[in-house]
From Swiss-Prot:
Keywords: Carbohydrate metabolism, Hydrolase, Magnesium, Metal-binding. Catalyzes the dephosphorylation of 2-phosphoglycolate. The keyword Metal-binding applies. Belongs to the archaeal SPP-like hydrolase family. Its cofactor is Mg(2+). One of its GO terms (molecular function) is magnesium ion binding. It holds the Pfam family Hydrolase_3. It comes from Picrophilus torridus (strain ATCC 700027 / DSM 9790 / JCM 10055 / NBRC 100828 / KAW 2/3). This is Phosphoglycolate phosphatase. Mg(2+) binds at residues 23, 25, 185, 189.
């Protein structure tokens, strides 16, 4: 069958993409973390399998999964813990991050946040910007690292990131990297953007994420999803 160039690329996209991986804060939500109704509708219109990957905690992502209404994987705490086929799987421990936060809270402005009570593999905190070099160095000395989601700072174990989560899903589904579309906006999304999957971001994304993206939407804070899905011909 003869295809024009445009039809060929539409065919490639629709046959390639078997999983859409979505960040939450700044990708589905606005600056105040209010979820975009347009984002919810876009996800509900999508026939491709959807997964959420976030620095937030598993109970929050589980609530989003239920109330948005999709049947897919959820990876919380930047890939540290997941709900896979109704089973909770934990890939890292919180002992190191928790001990580190307790220690640095004694001599820096670092303070834990409310959701730490539900964290099982990481810790989250706020701190003065001018102390971050000290905090970063101390984290590295303990085989930990700090990542900024744009909303809070996360203390993570070595190897714990969203790229780890995407690799897990690729293995579970037995698909290739080019079968995956990732969408995110900030520093803690960079690990999944570096895998060689298809990638897109909203207009509010960091400059680094924009540079790493195959497609940058002109729309922001969740309103980009319809645009991105149309670009990859996942919805019409």
């Amino acid at each position: 069958m003869f295809m024009t160039k445009d039809l060929f690329f539409v065919y490639i996209f629709t046959t390639m993409i078997k999983l859409v991986v979505l960040d939450v804060d700044g990708t589905l939500t606005d600056k105040s973390r209010m979820i975009s109704v347009n984002a919810v509708n876009a996800i509900r219109n999508l026939k491709t399998k959807v997964a959420l990957v976030s620095g937030n905690v598993l109970p929050v992502l589980y609530g989003l999964k239920i109330y948005i209404g999709f049947d897919g994987y959820i990876f919380a705490e930047n890939g540290g813990i997941a709900l896979i086929n109704n089973n909770i799987e934990k890939f890292f421990e919180k002992d190191g991050p928790e001990s580190f936060l307790n220690d640095i809270s004694g001599y820096t402005s670092a303070r834990g946040i409310l959701t730490n009570r539900w964290r099982e593999t990481s810790m989250a905190f706020t701190a003065n910007h001018d102390e971050m070099d000290i905090i970063d160095r101390e984290a590295a000395s303990r085989d930990l690292y700090i990542v900024d989601s744009g909303f809070t700072l996360h203390i993570l174990n070595k190897g714990q990131d969203k790229g780890f989560a995407v690799k897990k899903m690729i293995d579970i589904m037995n698909i290739d990297y080019n079968n995956v579309l990732v969408i995110g906006d900030s520093q803690n999304d960079e690990s999944m953007f570096s895998l060689g999957t298809l990638s897109a971001c909203p207009g509010n994304a960091s400059e680094k994420i924009k540079e790493m993206s195959n497609y940058v939407s002109g729309k922001c804070y969740g309103d980009e999803l319809f645009d991105v899905f149309r670009h990859f011909d996942l919805i019409h």
